[in-house]
Curated annotation (Swiss-Prot):
Its job: Binds directly to 16S ribosomal RNA.
Domain of life assignment: Bacteria
Name of this chain's protein: Small ribosomal subunit protein bS20
Pfam name, any one: Ribosomal_S20p
Family per similarity comment: Belongs to the bacterial ribosomal protein bS20 family.
PANTHER family listed in its UniProt record: 30S RIBOSOMAL PROTEIN S20, SMALL RIBOSOMAL SUBUNIT PROTEIN BS20C
Protein species of origin: Campylobacter jejuni subsp. doylei (strain ATCC BAA-1458 / RM4099 / 269.97)
One GO term describing the cellular component: cytosol
GO BP: any one term: translation
UniProt xrefs under HAMAP family: Ribosomal_bS20
Keywords, sorted A to Z: Ribonucleoprotein, Ribosomal protein, RNA-binding, rRNA-binding
Location of the region described as Disordered in the Swiss-Prot/TrEMBL record: 1-20
One GO MF term attached to the UniProt entry: small ribosomal subunit rRNA binding
């Protein structure tokens, strides 16, 4: 248990940041999974819609400071390549 006021505040902040990061991490996994599943099923329309949602969500995470801009671009690029491979 924290003995100083500043240490108590840091503990509170850590809890809030942990919850926020867990939310973003889970969301990132879920939207990526949705695109990959749609691509695996060969459904071009569903894959494109999922990619559109993923693109918007991933770049929103950049503005919230969860991931860096280059990381977001790389993830979106790889998902787009996957969707474009669908015949």
């Amino acid at each position: 248990m924290a003995n100083h006021k500043s240490a108590e505040k840091r503990a509170r902040q850590t809890i809030k940041k942990t919850e926020r990061n867990r939310f973003y991490r889970t969301r990132l996994k879920n939207i990526t999974k949705a695109v990959r599943e749609a691509a695996a099923n060969g459904d071009k329309n569903a894959a494109n819609e999922a990619l559109k949602v993923a693109n918007k969500s991933i770049h929103a995470m950049v503005s919230h400071g969860f991931i860096k801009k280059q990381t977001a671009s790389r993830r979106v690029s790889r998902l787009a390549l996957l969707v474009n491979k669908i015949a």
